Amino acid sequence: MAGKGKTAARTLEDLTLDSGYGGAADSFRSSSVSLCCSDTHLSYAHGGNCWHLTESMHSRHNSLDTVNTVLAEDTEILECSGQCAKLPELEEDVPWSLGEVEGALRKDEELCVGNASREILAKLSALVSRALVRIAREAQRMSLRYARCTKHEIQSAIKMVLSWTISVNCITAALSALSLYNMSTGDKFSRGKSTRCGLIFSVGKFFRWMVDSRVALRIHEHAAIYLSACMESLFREVFTRVQRSALVEKENGVPKFSVESLEQAINNDSELWGLLQPYQHLICGKNASGVLSLPDSLNLHRDQQRAGKTGEGHAYSQAELRTIEQSLLATRVGSIAELSDLVSRAMHHLQPLHIKNPSNGTPVHQNRTGSVHWEPEALYTLCYFMHCPQMEWENPNVEPSKITLHTERPFLVLPPLMEWIRVAVAHTEHRRSFSVDSDDVRQAARLLLPGVDCEPRQLKADDCFCATRKLDAASTEAKFLQDLGFRMLNCGRTDLVKQAVNLLGPDGINSMSEQGMTPLMYSCVRGDEAMVQMLLDAGADINSEVPSSLHKHPSVYPDTRQGTPLTFAVLHGHVPVVQLLLDARANVEGAIQESTENYTETPLQLASAAGNFELVSLLLERGADPLIGTTYRNGISSGPLGEMNSYSLAAAHGHRNVFRKLLSQVEKDKGDVLSLEEMLAEGSEAVERRAPQNEGTLRTGKAKLRALREAMYHSAEHGHVDITIDIRSLGVPWTLHTWLESLRTCFVQQRRPLIQGLLKDFSCIKEDEYTEELITHGLPLMFQILRASKNEVISQQLSVIFTQCYGPFPIPKLTEIKKKQTSRLDPHFLNNKEMSDVTFLVEGKPFYAHKVLLFTASPRFKSLLSNRPAAENTCIEISHVKYNIFQLVMQYLYCGGTESLHIRNTEIMELLSAAKFFQLDALQRHCEIICSKNITNDSCVDIYKHARFLGALELAGFIEGFFLKNMVLLIELENFKQLLYEVPADSPGPGPSYDVLHDLEQTLALRIRSIHLSTSKGSIV
């Protein structure tokens, strides 16, 4: 083995504490290595190089043969179905619908979705829901440290659960969605979160699902955006890989999927198969056949080819490449020295690749990823899980044990080394550390191995302690002493405070750890009331802040910046500690200073999000301002006080009692404060003209109105309709989006009284606020309610809405078809036996005509004349047409137009049928125009049915406009209600089958688009 002798001579400290690469850095000549496929190995579409279980793998002659080593015990493959714990099946409790899944797949134009059946979509949804559960479980564990789930927890969970390649794609999609969301501040309350993010999946549904699943006490809206974008991207990733499978048949160029082909494609994909299994542990790096393979992102073959063309890099031999591959794919080791060498080699090649695909949310930390190294205890812990006692038998000085007390883990459940590194390093990066410790490895083992569990990592001062060799001896000694001081304070013994302070360094009691936290902050996290009091008595700064700069404190967690001891006490819900800090005159707003922007949540925001009524009441009593929001660090904010204030956070999480408590807070100068009703009644411009002495009052009223509008938006998005109705009852106006989301929630929850109240409130929405959402989401929802509900009140209210949306403009008129007559005869020849060459038999009476005219009149006449018998005197019998009606048809043809026709009202419908039968378009249109002028409330249903029977779509469309314009009156008529609610059936006539409600929806959509959404505003009607 290359470099084996040299590695054996190095100490474990050298292998772990130097550059992070151990002996691998000088074992090879360059870090730019391609992992190319050997000709003897099969190449898989989604896995790079694959290693099969062959007889040669039984060899024990080399430690690198630990790749896919097959032990005798492995012949009995683990029956996971009976021994391994399984994930909970979500079934219907997923935050997406099958329609949204199909829409997400069709969003990618390169995907040929075709007509994917509901069976395929349901199977795909069930499989991907397991990935959702895995990501949510990991995010839930990490959220315990700071009692909230942000985008950082979701991102780290994605990196832990998904493979190298898929996680990069999903995080890229999440970053893109969040960027779009942050930039869409102009009309944000009038558009849904998903629309603002460019997503198909509902961000509001994902947020509600995360709250209901208790992923964390507090869910940041960016976390929901990340998770929804990730899952949408994952659906497309899975579908793309299935499409590429050779097992997918094609029908006329369109892929033809089946459940079997879907499962087979996933079984052959080493990056998907384990992810989508139902077991709690995550099977990584191998497919259903047990074949180990490298993911696409670890294959540098193309990069090396490009480097070779430019003269950069170095081409490695097949032996060197095989060594690298075996290092990454090793599943068992025989000793700690062997593991140290394998980890060093793997880190040497994984970290440059990781820098090429950055996905960490903190750029400063990402730039230093190359310095991540493994602590000695981390390697010992990893060796415990990967150790194979049989591999020690190669040593002649070691005699095999005669009695076995332990059962080896079967190969099927052993992950390759690259997966251990991937998960452990993801944990390290999440806590912003530069060294992998033993707890990171234990967390990885809990995820990757069956039957292994450990407690979630707690927030401690030594989380990110690192004695790197880049520090001199004196600095390192000071760090160790400071760490000892933090440990002494964290043990909870108040009698050690003075001794600990002497060890903390020049800043004394206010010294900060690598995480930027003081001893007082850690005591507040633990809820140690006695220690908090001792530290305050010792002079601890009660308003100290976590620094924003990462220069001196590189492991500061992004969402704790500017956090104070009060912030951490509120985060973890320690009411006595909060009371103690407030009594000691801690700033109730945290780190906020007057006239400065707030880049972190205030204690009241955190308490409101968690729904802690006791804490909210306490903070309000001490003067906390519920109107203060958060300004994001990108500088984008729609309001001067920031976003997601306490009202919004309580509403977003569904804490109705907390929201009402915030509303009931009495302003200090109640007599001078404008009420919301006054603000809404007078309007912003009128209020601004008030006396200058009311400027502060004006700002307060405006800020509260803006805060409640924002809260209304979030409560509607997340399905907390009761809170939305509470806000509406205060006089806050609807937007079309919040009204539609509330109506959708009430319909899903079958809350009929609320539906009636919402429908009644539609008239409050101004017509100039109508958007495309009314057509794409509103109309389908309202017609679905009309179809499902036979309630007369709801039907009447919907009729009012449809009539209002149709507008006051007249129904678009039907126009005559100006068709030039190809041939024409004098009316004298009409039904004239002289010179007649064709005779029609109508109701037993002859009707004489001329072929020269009829042959070019229409295709129907041409067919009748062409198919007549050869005998000259044979009559053409016309059935189903009355003699007087046929005479009108012939009069139209001989006169060359409709001007000379005198049609009675009793004849118009029969003439319309005859014109349709003889395919005389101009005559048909003339009849339709006459019908449209004679439509009444009593006759409209019968005329509509006849028009649909004949397939006279123009007339049917006109009558649909009549229905919508007069629906308030028509909905009271029994025959109209029967028309609406009858089950669509195949039409017995020449016209196609129809669904009245669907056709009314389409007609109304066209109308709204023409008069409300077009620039002409009704000029086309």
UniProtKB/Swiss-Prot annotation:
One Gene Ontology CC term in the entry: membrane
Gene encoding the protein: abtb3a
Organism ancestry: Eukaryota, Metazoa, Chordata, Craniata, Vertebrata
CDD domains xref list: HFD_ABTB2-like
Domain BTB positions: 836-902
Transmembrane segments: 160-180
Keywords: ANK repeat, Membrane, Repeat, Transmembrane, Transmembrane helix
Keyword Repeat in annotation: yes
Native source species: Danio rerio (Zebrafish)
Membrane disposition: Single-pass membrane protein
Main location: membrane
Ranges: ANK repeats: 515-544, 561-590, 599-628, 642-671
SMART domains: ANK, BTB
GO MF terms, alphabetically ordered: DNA binding; protein heterodimerization activity; structural constituent of chromatin
Subcellular location: Membrane
Key word Cytoplasm present: no
Protein name per the record: Ankyrin repeat- and BTB/POZ domain-containing protein 3-A
